[in-house]
Amino acid sequence: MDHALIFGVHDMMPHRFLGPHRIAHYLRNNGWDIEVVDFASFWTLEQLKNFIKSRIHKKTKFIGFGCWFGNWPENIDMLSHWIKDYYPEIKIIYGSHTYPKFNNESIDYYTVGYAEKAIIQLANYFQNNGTIKFDTRWENKKIILANDTYPAFPMNELGVIYEHRDLIEPWEWLTIEFTRGCKFSCKFCNYPILGVKDDHSTAASDFEYTVRDAYDKFGVTNYYTADETLNQDKSMIEKYANVADTLNFKLRMHGFMRADLLIANKDTWDPLSRLGVFGHMYGIETFNKKTGSSVGKGMDPLKVKEGLLEIREWFDAIEPYRGNINMVCGLPFETKETWESGIEWLMKNWTSKGDISATYALEIPLSSMDSKLSFISNNWKALGYRRRKTPSESLHAVSSLKYADELLDWENDYMDLDWAVKSCNTIYKQYKVDMGVSVWHWGDHGLMNLSFKDLQKKQKHYNQWPNKELEDFLQRYIKKKIEL
């Protein structure tokens, strides 16, 4: 049986990055022996070398690095060169949703996007002289744009079966994927799979097997969901809630939700609660009616506000609830006054129980090698945006600079990028005292022996990594992994 190692590379401890485990699961189903190594960014170089020495054998064909949005730390860079020096016959593969923004002559192949189909094609290529399509825009890197050339969507089997050698502990939160793609097409979104028409969600039996297996092996009951919009389909929610009803343990899940759908479809609240979805991340974006309508979120703002308060009260009466709200400053027709009015409402109404509101300045990528451009990116002039005459002081602070090749330094008739960034920074300073633990970080506190009710009351910066509990877990994991 052919063998490979896949390292999970990201900077968030103690999250187990889903990508490497998903690729490993898919390869195992195709006859491979794959071992995943988590938290690789936090291993020392010598620990990584010793581990590899203990695992390499004559059937080892490649070593992969699954990188969270291009994360490529120094220890991994040095490790890749060491691998190429000591094991030149073994291929090195980089996988991520973003193109590499670094140079590394030791990497043989790069996959960008959802890569289940691409990795099978690639393995056949370098082992059996098969055919492969590389991205011809790159002369010095062999890159496969998986979403275009070997699309792994739609896909109705998205489960991951973990192995005992993954050394998962019962307090951990794993990531689960129900469906791939979003049925909506918000004008600011550059996610590559938008406007999905049909239900391609994973089968109920697949979901049941996945969560039962994780519980039976490790005692895990808590999950982050990878779906772009968890509540986009009523029948899908009911399907999984019916499975949850049959389990002899209670699930807890956190994920991305559309608040307007929740408000309009109260009949989804019960199945969501039965499924254990009490952590909600809402992309509200704006409380300006004209702005919301222009980007695909046209529900009346007053109805949204009233609905949010009702949602919080209903879910929190059953289990400790966390509702995170994201707002985007600078969308079409948003004025400084309407923006500040919306923030004022959040400050007054959405900080109880530590509910957190995150604000972001609008990013308008003009070019990107690794993602689709949004409607706003493709139509920014028609939407009233212009290039700033005076270069912005804040362009470097906008997060997509890590992923986009060029961002628009924008202004319109209402504000500019610099004002938007400064406004968001000011808002953060004002509400950070009241910020609770984000929906994506409840798992960080699993070793603290806190009830969800107690955790709901904690502030965002409570016992953050690095801390003794997680450091002990990391070293425990590394020691056991090397000794296996």
Per-segment meaning from a language model:
Residues 1-212, 217-219, 480:
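Acidic, low-complexity intrinsically disordered segments
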Residues 1-9, 28-29, 33, 45-62, ...:
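Radical SAM enzyme core and accessory elements
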Residues 14, 40-47, 71-73, 230-235, ...:
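Acidic-and-aromatic substrate-binding clefts and catalytic sites of carbohydrate-active enzymes
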Residues 15, 153-319, 329:
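Radical SAM [4Fe-4S] cluster-binding motif and immediate context
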Residues 30-32, 217-218, 247, 275, ...:
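A structural motif corresponding to the C-terminal end of an alpha-helix
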Residues 98-103, 184, 234-235, 290-295, ...:
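Flexible glycine/acidic-rich beta-alpha junction loops that bind and position SAM and/or redox cofactors
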Residues 102-121, 271-279, 343-363:
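Structural recognition of alpha->loop->beta junctions
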